[in-house]
C-alpha cells in the first residue's frame, strides 16, 4: 500500500486537560505508532481540544490557564497542536460538535470533503497531473511555491491561534478549491482524510453508562468518525464494547492500540497530578512536564484547591 492509498488521519483528543499530563502526550505518540504499524494509516496531525469552562467539573481551572499549559506540553512536538475553538465558544460543546467543527474546518482549508468511516469521500484532493510538472496551484497566491515544511493550516482567522495538521508534501499534492474547473486533461490522485477521536478506555467505558451520552451523538462519533482507544490500567476493551449495542454495531470502527510498551497509564491522570501538587509530592514530575509544573507554580494553580 502506497502513501497515496493509505488513509491520512488527524487524531483529536477532547478533555479537561486539568492539567495536561505526560500521559496525554504519550497517548498521541502510542496511537500514531500503532496506526502506522497497521500499514493502513498515515497520521498527519494531532489536535488537543480543552473543554469549555462551563463544563462545570469541580476544580476545573480557567481555560486561559489550561490552554497555556497544553501549549507548553506540546511545544516540542512537530505534529501535535492545541486548538482553542472549543474554549472560545459561548458554552460547552459536545464531543460530536467538536469533531464536526474540525471536519468542516479541514474541508475549508484543504478544499476537499473529509471522508468518514462508512462513506469515503468521492471528492479528490487534487494532485499533480501524472507525467507533468506544472507550477503548483494554490487558493492563496501568496503561498510560496516551495514551502520548507509540510505543515498546513497555521492560522485560520486571528482568533484561532495555531491549529494543527500536517500537509502531505506539496511536491506530491496541490490543494485547490473542490469546485475548481480544471478541465479534463488532468489525471488526479485521491487521498482519504479522516479525523479520529483519540481517547482512553475510560471514555469508551463511559459510552456504556445509560443516559450519559446522547445516542445520536454516539452514532456519529463511532459510526461516522471512528475512535482510537489507548487502554488504561489493563482495561478489557472487548468486554467494554460488548456492553453497548452501538459499540458492538460499530466495532470495526474502534481501533484499540496494542503495543509492547508497558506504559503506566496512571500517569495520564490529571487528578493524581493535582493531588501530588497539593501534597508537595516530588513524584509530580512523573505526571507533568517541567514547563507545565513551572507554570502551575508561578500561577499558583491547584496548590490550595481540592478535588
From Swiss-Prot:
Gene Ontology annotations of biological process type: NAD biosynthetic process; negative regulation of cytoplasmic translation; neuron projection maintenance
Named cofactor requirement(s): Mg(2+)
Gene Ontology terms for molecular function: ATP binding; nicotinamide-nucleotide adenylyltransferase activity; nicotinate-nucleotide adenylyltransferase activity; protein ADP-ribosyltransferase-substrate adaptor activity
Keyword Nucleotide-binding in annotation: yes
Post-translational modification: Degraded in response to injured neurite. Degradation is caused by polyubiquitination by MYCBP2 after recognition by FBXO45.
Similarity remark: Belongs to the eukaryotic NMN adenylyltransferase family.
Complex formation: Monomer.
Reported function: Nicotinamide/nicotinate-nucleotide adenylyltransferase that acts as an axon maintenance factor. Axon survival factor required for the maintenance of healthy axons: acts by delaying Wallerian axon degeneration, an evolutionarily conserved process that drives the loss of damaged axons. Catalyzes the formation of NAD(+) from nicotinamide mononucleotide (NMN) and ATP. Can also use the deamidated form; nicotinic acid mononucleotide (NaMN) as substrate but with a lower efficiency. Cannot use triazofurin monophosphate (TrMP) as substrate. Also catalyzes the reverse reaction, i.e.
Name of the molecule in the record: Nicotinamide/nicotinic acid mononucleotide adenylyltransferase 2
Source species of the chain: Pongo abelii
Gene designation per UniProt: NMNAT2
Amino acid at each position: 500500500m502506497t502513501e497515496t492509498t493509505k488513509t491520512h488521519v488527524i487524531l483529536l483528543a477532547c478533555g479537561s486537560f486539568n492539567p495536561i499530563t505526560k500521559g496525554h502526550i504519550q497517548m498521541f505518540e502510542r496511537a500514531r505508532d500503532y496506526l502506522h504499524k497497521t500499514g493502513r494509516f498515515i497520521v498527519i496531525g494531532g489536535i488537543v481540544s480543552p473543554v469549555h469552562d462551563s463544563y462545570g467539573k469541580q476544580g476545573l481551572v480557567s481555560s486561559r490557564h489550561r490552554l497555556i499549559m497544553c501549549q507548553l506540553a506540546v511545544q516540542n512536538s512537530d505534529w501535535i497542536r492545541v486548538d482553542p475553538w472549543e474554549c472560545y465558544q459561548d458554552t460547552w460543546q459536545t464531543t460530536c460538535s467538536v469533531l464536526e467543527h474540525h471536519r468542516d474546518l479541514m474541508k475549508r482549508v484543504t478544499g476537499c470533503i473529509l471522508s468518514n468511516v462508512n462513506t469515503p469521500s468521492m471528492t479528490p484532493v487534487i494532485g499533480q497531473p501524472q507525467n507533468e510538472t506544472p507550477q503548483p496551484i494554490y487558493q492563496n497566491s501568496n503561498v510560496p511555491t516551495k514551502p520548507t515544511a509540510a505543515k498546513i493550516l497555521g492560522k485560520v482567522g486571528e482568533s484561532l491561534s495555531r491549529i494543527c495538521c500536517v500537509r502531505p508534501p506539496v511536491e506530491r499534492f496541490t490543494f485547490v478549491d473542490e469546485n475548481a474547473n480544471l478541465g479534463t486533461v488532468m489525471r488526479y490522485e485521491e487521498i482519504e482524510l479522516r479525523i479520529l477521536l483519540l481517547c482512553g478506555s475510560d471514555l469508551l467505558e463511559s459510552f456504556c453508562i445509560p443516559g450519559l451520552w446522547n445516542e445520536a451523538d454516539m452514532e456519529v462519533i463511532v459510526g461516522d468518525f471512528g475512535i482510537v482507544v489507548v487502554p488504561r490500567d489493563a482495561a478489557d476493551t472487548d468486554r467494554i464494547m460488548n456492553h453497548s449495542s452501538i459499540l458492538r454495531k460499530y466495532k470495526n470502527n474502534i481501533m484499540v492500540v496494542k503495543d509492547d510498551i508497558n506504559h503506566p497509564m496512571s500517569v495520564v491522570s490529571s487528578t493524581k497530578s493535582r493531588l501530588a501538587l497539593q501534597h508537595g509530592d516530588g513524584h509530580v514530575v512523573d505526571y507533568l512536564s517541567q514547563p507545565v509544573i513551572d507554570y502551575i507554580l508561578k500561577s499558583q494553580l491547584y496548590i490550595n484547591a481540592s478535588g
